[in-house]
Amino acid sequence: TAMYYKVRHYQYKNRIGNLKSEAVGVVSGEKHFPIFPGNMIFKPLTKSKPFSTPLYAYAEVFWSTIINEYFMPAPRYELAICEGYEAVNEKYLDYGTAVPMAYKEGESLLNLLEFFRKYPDEKVDIDNYVNYCQMFYDYRDIFEADFLQEHQEMAEQLAMQVLISVLKGDQNYHYENVAFLCDKDGGIISLAPMIDHEFSTYFMFPDDISRHVYWLMELSKSIRGWEVRPGEYDNFKDSEERKLMEKSATCIHKNLLYIKEHYPQTTEEFLDKAEKLKTALTEASEDFLIRGNTEYPDCADSSAWLIGKARYKDKDEEKASAYEAELYGKGKKLDFRDVSISAINEIKAVISQMEEVLRKRE
């Protein structure tokens, strides 16, 4: 595995089209990402995306490479700069990633939220689904839905994707991240390949070690299924939010046990592949180091998104300016070697924790 950290350069004015993806439902808003020759989509870093730092882009390169090499075909992300983009769409940066489109002319994607709105299933309570960043999602009801009960192969593919999402410590693997690939008549062909790897625990909060460790522990606890202690989430003042966190705290474990019981072959296949990855991370760790590219930003401030949120989402310029003053110069220069070494160790630990749950004889 050689990780590829060269930067692709685009000019916004040279785009050949725009990918219009209406964010359906829960997080509303339209995204018009530019498309360039070779069917490459430029996906910018967003100023209002929670906890966003340049590592979000590096994480996409890192995980798409690993998923492709060790698990299943997936579109490969590359670092990219699109000059002139921020000038036109100021809530985005000129920095981001470039990724080939996941579907061909005439095809389209239908995510799980859209799917269950179109084909309701009483086992899936889609109306009460919430897209909440930094939360783990329960996939058991989705597997129980008639469509996946009747389509074994797609269910196995989904099981593999859920397992990989746990491995990459995805803090945002919600029902809009999983999609079916549809033909021109809307007929479902297969599960779409995995995209979107930004919210990987190992690459979050590089500038704030205590928060980094807190969320790493949340991931570990959810994998192991440790019971929630009374009052554990009392620091979440909003009762809805608190309920979500309490549910999230054990749901990875439930997903793992469900997949292990219902999809034993996929579980074995995943364990074999994860074991190979763990060996490579140990024996050839140099291959997995993130090489910071000098053309790309190298400063991280996990709170800077609050400025963007105030300015572009809440339209509150006063609040935005206050955050700007408060956070000015707070960013931390990224030490890519340091980040990579700790990420490699954390990933190996998570593989071991997953193995423990998935290999355990009941």
How would you name each of these model-derived features?
Residues 183-362:
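C-terminal catalytic region of ATP-dependent kinase domains
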Residues 102-142, 226-257:
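Extended low-complexity intrinsically disordered regions
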